[in-house]
Structures are given as structure tokens and as C-alpha cells.
């Protein structure tokens, strides 16, 4: 078996996690108490969904995941929520006082006390696997726990499980919508560690997903539940081929191989189509070509970033439902002829496709319509550089005046860490510029030292 362990850190990580496990359970027909009437092999078996769920002798299915937060309220919602019987109590770990939006608290003072407990639980989950293929890590980098404890845990996972893949689903601060003043500090400090310790990071931001909810689903005032259910669809599409048997299956490590041209350039855009409300879906059924085009629309991106400002390096299309390879090839061929969608000249093929025959599932009473086919795209574009430039600019404005820095230093950080992280991101911006540079020959000389 190729098992995957999910790690949900901080409020954002946990709430996205809730939405994901809710959706997985619906997709596999697992009840909130972990029973699965359709499952004939009791106690394990080689069903594809065992990559994400382990089975007890009593036929209960337990998610292979942990929820981790420095304060109890969010984890308590899981402990008392609909799916409280699904999780083993040891999988839900919470501390007493939160990180207070402070990276240093999450990474040094408070995070340090809880991280060993978390690693201990992860070790138990890992021992329960026959062939662990990697970790999915869910966090946001604007707050204190997701950024500080998140990066601390990733660093420790690199030490303990060096060769295993780590995929991050990371919520970045949005350009306009802000939840904390010190977001730029936390995200820069955290990205510094993500650069080294994740293999692929899929970037998300709330503002982009708010806009999608407003525009495509006609939700006037989207809540986090609306956003998280949308994110869950994306993550479900990515992991569908690990959980179901399909025609063109995609392994976690395959994402890495196909999407990451250079180790540092591993931050991905994601999009999902079709996003339509139930009222509209009643009147239209979308073809493979239409949903493929929709996935490339700048407005479909789950992070505020316009791919037209850069070039694609690689792109992974995961189809599910009623889709055959012939349609996919035709759609991809059409995309390649479009002038607006440009690839770098050193990557001529650029597409990796996966097909899974399990049609998309929707949460009953949710916003999304039940459709016959859907596609999720993860792409590596040079335009992602603009997200980092935006963050760095905000960081610089504050750091020039050393505003708020004393809070971090007071928790045991050194000022040198700020400048080190900032220099690392400056180098990253430069990497993006070089990769997008016009010709492959010109870039060749400069890149010799770098990689």
C-alpha cells in the first residue's frame, strides 16, 4: 500500500482538513462513525481508499491524519462535531495558549513544547503503514501557529523521514483581505522554511476563493465553510487517483517529478472547473474542452495571481468522471494553440494528465452542483513570482521601521533571522525571473552556480 498521512496545523489547516475529510467520507461511503457498509474486506484489505484510512478489526475506518493547534477552541470543534467518532482522540492535539499571530511563538517558545508529542503521534501513524509515500501538510502562513509550528514540524519531518515527499497546501495572505497586521513577517519567515522543507507547495488565498464564490456560485457573503468546501474539491481531485482505481493514476511523487523543474521553484497555482451552482447546472452540461478552458482562466486561479503575466513551466491536469483520453488530448491540443497560454521555450511538452473515472462528489446542501465531469489543474508558472514580490514589498515597509519586531525578538528570535529569510525570498524572486527569461541558452550561463 502507498499510504499518505495528512497533517493539519493551526486554525486554517484544521478547518480545511474538516472539509476534506467530510468530502472523503462522502466519496467512499464512510459514515461519521467510521463504519463503511459497502466495504466487504474487514480489517485492512487492499482497497484503494486504505491509502487515506486505516481499518480496525471492528471494521471502523480511521483517517490517517493529525490535527494540531496551540489553542484548544478549533480542535474542540472537531472533538464535538459531526465527525467526532471518526477520529481517534490521540489524533487531535491541542495546547493551552495560542501563538498570538507570532511566528516566533509558534516556532520557538510554545510550538517547541508540543512538537515532540505531534511527532510521536505521526510516528504511530507511520508505523501503521506498510509503504508510507509521503505527507500532505495543511496550514496558513499568515498566522502564528500555521507559520511557526508548521515550519518547525516540516523541519523535523525532514530529519525523521528524509526521503518521503511532503506536499503543502498553504494559504497565503491575500493582497487586499488581511486578518493580521504581521502577516508579511510570518509568511516571509515561514516561506524561508517551506523553500527547503516541502517538495511541492500548492498556494491558496482567501481573496481569490471569495471572488470565485461570489462570481461563479452567486454567494453574496461567502463564509469560511464555503471557501473550505471549494478547497476540499481541489484537494480531493488531486488525491482521487490515490484513493480510487483509475485509468491514468498519479502518485504523490509524480507531481514532484512533473511539476518541479528546479528544487526551489516548487510553488504551484491551482484551479478547478466547473464551479457552477446547482441552479445553473440544471441547464448546462459541460464538455471536456469547456472545463479544460475554464481551468486555464485567470479568474479560476485559487490564488490572486495572473498566469498571463508569466509563462507556464509545467502543468498537471487531473480529470475525474466521464472523461476519455481522446477528449483530453484534443482539449490539450487546443490549449497549446492559444496565444494567451504561453509555455517557457525550454519545456516543450508541459502537460501531465490524469484521469479518474469516479465522478466528483458534492456535499449535500453545499454550494456546488453535482456534475458528470470535472478537472483540477495544478500548474507551475513564472507568474507566481508576483505573489512573493507583493509579500516582500509589504515586509520591507514594516521592517524598514523595525515595526513589531520586538514581539518576535522577545520570544527568542534574532533579528538576523528576518534578514536571512528576506534575502532567501529575494533570491527566490530572482530565480523566477531567470526561469522566465527568454531563451534557454542565455539563462544557461547564469544558472551554473545556482543549481
Curated annotation (Swiss-Prot):
The keyword Magnesium is annotated on this UniProt entry: yes
Binding site for GTP: 11, 71, 144-145, 179, 206, 228
Main location: cytoplasm
A Gene Ontology biological process term: microtubule-based process
Binding site for Mg(2+): 71
Record-linked InterPro entries: Alpha_tubulin (IPR002452), Tub_FtsZ_C (IPR008280), Tubulin (IPR000217), Tubulin/FtsZ-like_C (IPR037103), Tubulin/FtsZ_2-layer-sand-dom (IPR018316), Tubulin/FtsZ_GTPase_sf (IPR036525), Tubulin_C (IPR023123), Tubulin_CS (IPR017975)
UniProt superkingdom: Eukaryota
Catalytic activity: GTP + H2O = GDP + phosphate + H(+)
Post-translational modification: Undergoes a tyrosination/detyrosination cycle, the cyclic removal and re-addition of a C-terminal tyrosine residue by the enzymes tubulin tyrosine carboxypeptidase (TTCP) and tubulin tyrosine ligase (TTL), respectively. Acetylation of alpha chains at Lys-40 stabilizes microtubules and affects affinity and processivity of microtubule motors. This modification has a role in multiple cellular functions, ranging from cell motility, cell cycle progression or cell differentiation to intracellular trafficking and signaling.
GO molecular function, one term: structural constituent of cytoskeleton
Residues the record marks as site: Involved in polymerization: 451
Keyword ATP-binding on entry: no
E.C. number(s) listed in UniProt: 3.6.5.-
Cofactor dependency: Mg(2+)
Active site: 254
Alphabetized UniProt keyword annotations: Acetylation, Cytoplasm, Cytoskeleton, GTP-binding, Hydrolase, Magnesium, Metal-binding, Microtubule, Nucleotide-binding
Modified residues (N6-acetyllysine): 40
GO cellular component: cytoplasm; microtubule
Pfam families: Tubulin, Tubulin_C
Similarity section: Belongs to the tubulin family.
Protein name: Tubulin alpha-1 chain
Gene it is expressed from: TUBA1
